[in-house]
Amino acid sequence: MKTHLRTIRCPSITIRWLLVLTLGAALPTAVTAQRADSPFPGGENPDGSLRPSARLTRLFTQDAYTEYTLLEPGSDKFRIRYFTEERRPGATELVNGTRGGSEGTDIEVYDPRTGKPLPFTYQAEDGGHAIHARLPRPVPKGGIGRVLIYKTYEDARTYQSYDKADARHDIRPGDITWVRSLAGYRRGVILPKGYAFLSSNVAAHVSTTSTGQLELHFANPSGLSNPLTIHARPTTATFTPTPYTDIFFDDVKTLYDLGAPESHTIRVDQIYSEYRKGSTPTLPLLGYAPLSDLRVIDLDTAKPLETSASGAATTVALGVPIVDDRQSAHLEITGTLSDPGYTVAGDMLKFDRTVKGLRNTILLPEGWEVASVSQAATIGVHEGRVFVALINLNAENQYRVVVTAKRRS
C-alpha cells in the first residue's frame, strides 16, 4: 500500500509520521528474479530446509556501525546513531532506507569530516520511508563517501514496557524488552538509566557509560541476521563508568595481501577512522607493521596526505584538523611488509603473525588453497584468490593467527 509522500528539506528537523504499512513487504521484482535464477538463492524451501546462499567474495563486511539508546520506558522510543558509507564513484547522495512500522523524529545528518550538518530529505516511500543525505562532495574514484545520522524511532513492537505484574512469567512493573533483527553490522545497545539486564541472547561485551548506563557491544562474524532480545528491569544498583575500549565501534580493517611466499613480502592495506583531536596524529599501524613504500590517502577526497617522522613514530598531516566529537579522518594506509613469519617449505605456505584490530583478512597468492586456520574465520574467493577473513570478538586487541596453504598442482 502506498503511503502519503511528503519531502522536508533541512539539516536538523523534528518530524512525525503516521504510516499505513503492509507488514510483509516483498523484495523488489528484479532482486527476486535474480535470486530465482541463481543456484545459490539463500533463504528457505517451503518445508523450512535451507537453500544454499551465495559464495563469499567480499574481503570485508561490517562497514556500518549502529548504536541504539533506549529512551524513557513506556515511550516506545529509541535514539539511533548510525555511521554509514557510499562507495559508488560520482555518487552525490547517500540513501538510508529505514524500516516500515517505525515513526521517525529528530533526524540530524552530519559530515564526519567537518562535524557540520548536511542537507537531507526525509520522505515516505512505498512500504516505508528513507533519508536522502546530500554528500558534501561527489564520491571520488578511490575514495568513500560517508555520513553520520542521528534519528529517533517510535516502535511499540520493538520496545515494550510492562506495567502489570505477572508472576507466571516473572514480570514486574517497569520491566522492559527490546527485540530487533540486527543484520550483520557492528552494534551497540544502551539501556535506560537505572536498568539492569535480566537477559540478552546474543554474546556481547558489557560496559557502563559515563552516564552510568549499561551498554552491549557486539558484532556478528557471519554478517547475517542477529535476532536480538533484551530483557531488563529497574534496579537500585548504582553503576559507575568502567574503563572500556569499544572494539566494535572501531572500524579498522587490515588486508594482508600475500606476495610470492619465497619473498616473505606482504602488501598491507589498512582503512580506519581517526578520532583523536589534533591535526597530525601518529599512524598506529607502523608500530607493529613497519612498511616500506608508505602511502596515506584521505578517503574523503582520495588525495594523498603528507607523512613525517616524529621520533620513533610517523605522523600524518590531516586535511581538516579534528576539534569535536562528531569529526574523524577516514584514512587508508598502504605499504609493503617484509615478514619472516611468512614462509614456504616445499608445497606448504605458512602465514604466522600477531594481528591487531577487529577485522583482518589474509589474501593468499593465486594458486594456493587453505589447509588450516588457527582462529575462527570465514573463507571466500576474491578475483580467483582464496582469502581468510577474521573478526575478533575478544576484548584483547591482538591475537596470533597461523594460516597454512597448499599449492595447486
Predicted regions and their residues:
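Surface-exposed, acidic/Ser/Thr-rich flexible loop segments
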Residues: 59, 128-208, 311-377
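C-terminal beta-strand-rich structural cap/linker in extracellular carbohydrate-active enzymes
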Residues: 213-241, 386-409
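N-terminal secretory signal peptides that target proteins for export/translocation
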Residues: 1-13
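Bacterial N-terminal signal peptides
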Residues: 14-28
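Solvent-exposed beta-hairpin/edge-strand motifs
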Residues: 38-49, 87-124, 179-203, 275-304, ...
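Short, solvent-exposed beta-strand/turn "edge" segments of beta-rich domains on protein surfaces
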Residues: 56, 67-83, 138-141, 178, ...
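N-terminal, polar/Ser/Thr-rich
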Residues: 33-75, 196, 227-262, 301
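Short, well-ordered beta-strand segments enriched in hydrophobic/aromatic residues
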Residues: 76-86, 189, 264-274, 333, ...
